[in-house]
Amino acid sequence: MQELDLIIVGAGPVGLYAAFYAGMRGLSVAIIESAQVAGGQPQNLYPEKLIYDIAGLPAVTGADLTKNLLEQLAQISHRLFLGEGVQKIEKEDGIFSVITDKSNRKAKAVLLTTGAGLLKPRKLGIDNEENLANEGKISYFITSLKEFEGKNVAVFGGGDSALDWSLMLEKVAKEVHLVHRRTAFRGHEMTVDRVMDSGIQVHTPYTFSNFNENDLELKKVKAEENLNFSIDKILVNYGFLTNQVSLAENLEVSRNGRVKADSMMQSNIEGLYVAGDASDYAGKMPLMSVGFGEAVHAINAMTKNLEFNHPLRGGHSSSIF
């Protein structure tokens, strides 16, 4: 394969949009993604969950967002390689080699949009949890709301995911019980208000005690008080453990494993840029909408800092399409 202008590692929302914008600017671009499906977390973990904080979209599901991004990407020339895990990134004589488990591709610049890395859900921590998960009694994310239709569901967690999923489940489930070990929730204030005004049964401060057949027992924190009710399914929203893998030698990362970026979204390695949840800098906000802007910033920076042997287009779509 001939040398590219840009290789993007990661085909989540930020990576897909970055590829579109790079192509719009006239860069030859390829995206490499380890999963078999593009779209990152919104597509693979919560395709039916509504996302509210993307400009111009009052609400969009993870699946529809991915569909829209792929349609947008189809407007420009690009290569998308799915099911390829990047193992190492090397640089020699100003050219990057992106080495995967299937190939070795070369480019003048690399943009990392790998998100939070490999994700592993935090579990309840009970003895028979794996068996209950295999039986479909315990889940950590939802790919189809139909599985919960007419069911009594208990959601464990106190953040935005637990709150959002409780509201989504209320539309299809028979009963929704939201369980949090603290009295106050960590989610967005507006979402907390919506939950409190809904028919969701909120149990705070309670923790898991026992689950036998369909009987769920909760224990009140710092009190000798238990609750019991019938539950068909448990959804655990305790977040995810991340495993960021350093792909390039001497690449500077922060304590949380994310890549340190300067004001141009460039790492300490010239030509190696980062955007989205994979990046870290002072004042970083881990929001998808912020990641889109970071990707644009990185691509505009590389068009100025690197030498390309062909003319580039301007940064305004109205002058291109």
Curated annotation (Swiss-Prot):
Binding positions for FAD per the UniProt entry: 33, 41, 46, 86, 119, 277, 318
Protein name: Ferredoxin--NADP reductase
Top EC class of this enzyme: oxidoreductase
Cofactor, free-text remark: Binds 1 FAD per subunit.
Record's subunit section: Homodimer.
Gene3D superfamilies on file: FAD/NAD(P)-binding domain
Catalytically driven reaction(s): 2 reduced [2Fe-2S]-[ferredoxin] + NADP(+) + H(+) = 2 oxidized [2Fe-2S]-[ferredoxin] + NADPH
Organism of origin: Lactococcus lactis subsp. cremoris (strain MG1363)
Matches recorded under InterPro entries: FAD/NAD-bd_sf, FAD/NAD-binding_dom, Fd--NADP_Rdtase_type_2, Ferredoxin-NADP_redctase_2
Family: Belongs to the ferredoxin--NADP reductase type 2 family.
Cofactor(s) recorded in Swiss-Prot or TrEMBL: FAD
UniProt keyword terms in alphabetical order: FAD, Flavoprotein, NADP, Oxidoreductase
Pfam families, alphabetized: Pyr_redox_2 (PF07992)
This enzyme's EC code(s): 1.18.1.2
GO molecular function: ferredoxin-NADP+ reductase activity; flavin adenine dinucleotide binding; NADP binding
Lineage: Bacteria, Bacillati, Bacillota, Bacilli, Lactobacillales
